[in-house]
Amino acid sequence: MALWGGRFTQAADSRFKSFNDSLRFDYRLAEQDIVGSIAWSKALVSVNVLSVQEQQQLEQALNHLLQSVQQDPEQILASDAEDIHSWVEQKLIEQVGDLGKKLHTGRSRNDQVATDLKLWCRDQGVHLLLALKTLQQQLVAVAAEHQSTVLPGYTHLQRAQPVTFTHWCLAYLEMFERDESRLTDALARLNTSPLGSGALAGTAYAIDREVLAADLGFTRATRNSLDAVSDRDHVMELMSVASISMLHLSRLAEDMIFYTTGEAGFIELADTVTSGSSLMPQKKNPDALELIRGKTGRVYGALAGMMMTVKALPLAYNKDMQEDKEGLFDALDTWFDCLQMAGLCFDGIKVNAARTLEAAKQGYSNATELADYLVAKGIPFREAHHIVGVAVVAAIGKGVALEELCLAELQQFSPLIEQDVYPILTIESCLEKRCALGGVSPKQVAHALQQAQARVKS
């Protein structure tokens, strides 16, 4: 059943109908469409379009339809309705007859779909916030188990300075907490009700839109009808939040993929998130992590596509906007799945502390400590930096670590170097000296972990 047939003398070409119809994807807005329709029916009572008895009859039928949809949303796809709004109205008329035809009074599909989409985004936001919080809790739990596990820190993917596995976990916690903050902000910004904006110029009925907004749980009604029906900022903002978070997930995945390699051997993932090779029986591939990394581009593509769609649209509604849903649905579904999968990768993870410590001791990651030692002896840092660089070259030439050079050899680079240098060059000293807020000293890491544990509980 089309909602607009009176103007036309010819039926739509079947190919156009297939091209134009959106039910195959906007059926996911069914619950929101029904909830919005219930609220609209109450508003129609206030302007004497519906009697109280009629509204109650409509609400009862809509609630029955809502229960049916919640039990089996896929049933909608068997219909030939143009979109979810048509389907709901058709089903309502089947239940209550001509009374169902009164529901759309004063309402356009333009403000209807804008409302549905915001309600859907709000509902999805709750699930995404929970998924982010769950991943944060998993990171903190793993971090708590590895406070004494030394890990090589990298710049340019070259060993740089030692850190700890806890510090590494908490670095990603910071990223996902920012994602949570961004999502919370975006959800607060979208929480305004377009319902009652009509097609573009507002509704002709003196409905109290603030009451209507409150009935649907919005903080307020939108202020401009032209903007309300054509605004898709919230779609792009949520996809942008998803894109940034997927970037963080991809970086996490890349780190962990590297850590699982035979060359690193820092961690081992559980069998439950890895796969094998059809040819090479020895393989254990980090497929879950690789898919997270791969799906990141998919979310970026959805955001870019949406921005290209709306970049030159005139006010107000245009059919181009029908393209907002598939990309949004896919982007948020993908983000949610990847958040869950990232958490799953931490279940049963094994950290090879002996190997991470061995790797942290290699690569002359204590060279900065020797430079700082010389600074303490009164040598300007830039000069100390050069002296240590020359010493590193000599150690490399001998195939030994800096701390394996004897005192006489070290004094060739600076006579100020004394026996007390050797305790300075240990891994323990390297960590201990990073004692400022946010550093890797055991005290600072313990403090950071304690704070993180408190945050993820709230």
Swiss-Prot record:
The keyword Lyase appears for this protein: yes
UniProt KW keywords: Amino-acid biosynthesis, Arginine biosynthesis, Cytoplasm, Lyase
Biological process according to GO: arginine biosynthetic process via ornithine; L-arginine biosynthetic process
Highest taxon listed in the record's lineage: Bacteria
Transmembrane segments: none
Listed pathway(s): Amino-acid biosynthesis; L-arginine biosynthesis; L-arginine from L-ornithine and carbamoyl phosphate: step 3/3
Protein's recorded name: Argininosuccinate lyase
Organism expressing this protein natively: Vibrio cholerae serotype O1 (strain ATCC 39315 / El Tor Inaba N16961)
Lineage, broadest ranks: Bacteria, Pseudomonadati, Pseudomonadota, Gammaproteobacteria, Vibrionales
